[in-house]
């Protein structure tokens, strides 16, 4: 289910890039809002959560919370290495794709 490859820095509107500064619940709430939408933004049917290095566990935690609360379903997990120009090494990256759970109702 997972693959390893070199990745670029492209990011789409339905993407959440997590960091170590916030907890997984914070990013799970953002994902829920992306599925719900608001006056300024239309809802998405798919959300992509990515994490680099030590933030991979935060990305996994956020996706797990969303799946446990029937907000989204994990449809794809991809691992890769991110090459940084600043440091001369490759950094592990995880990308988790969730689609809106069929039972999810925006409140």
UniProtKB/Swiss-Prot annotation:
One of its GO terms (molecular function) is metal ion binding. Changing residue 68 to A: No effect on nuclease activity. Keywords: Acetylation, Chromosome, Cytoplasm, DNA-binding, Hydrolase, Metal-binding, Nuclease, Nucleus, RNA-binding, Telomere, Transcription, Transcription regulation. Its cofactor is a divalent metal cation. Optimum pH is 7.5-9.0. GO terms for cellular component: chromosome, telomeric region; cytoplasm; nucleus. Its EC number is 3.1.-.-. The modification N6-acetyllysine is found at residues 23, 32. Acetylated. Exists in both acetylated and unacetylated forms but predominantly in an acetylated form. Deacetylated by Sir2A. Possesses DNA-binding and endonuclease activities. Binds DNA cooperatively in sequence-independent manner at the DNA minor groove. Exhibits apurinic/apyrimidinic site-driven endonuclease activity. Binds RNA; shows high affinity for poly(A) and a lower affinity for poly(U) templates. In vitro, prevents transcription after DNA binding. Associates with the telomeric region, the subtelomeric TARE6 repeat sequence and the var gene promoters. Belongs to the histone-like Alba family. Homodimer. Interacts (acetylated and unacetylated) with Sir2A. This is Endonuclease ALBA3. It comes from Plasmodium falciparum (isolate 3D7).
């Amino acid at each position: 289910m997972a693959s390893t490859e070199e990745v670029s820095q492209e990011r789409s509107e339905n993407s959440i890039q997590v960091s170590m500064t916030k907890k997984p619940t914070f990013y799970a709430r953002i994902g829920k809002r992306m599925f719900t939408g608001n006056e300024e933004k239309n809802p998405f049917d798919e959300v992509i959560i990515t994490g680099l290095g030590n933030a991979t566990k935060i990305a996994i935690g956020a996706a797990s919370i969303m799946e446990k609360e029937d907000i989204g379903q994990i449809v794809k997990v991809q691992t890769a290495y991110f090459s940084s120009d600043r440091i001369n090494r490759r950094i592990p990256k995880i990308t988790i794709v969730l689609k809106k759970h069929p039972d999810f109702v925006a409140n």
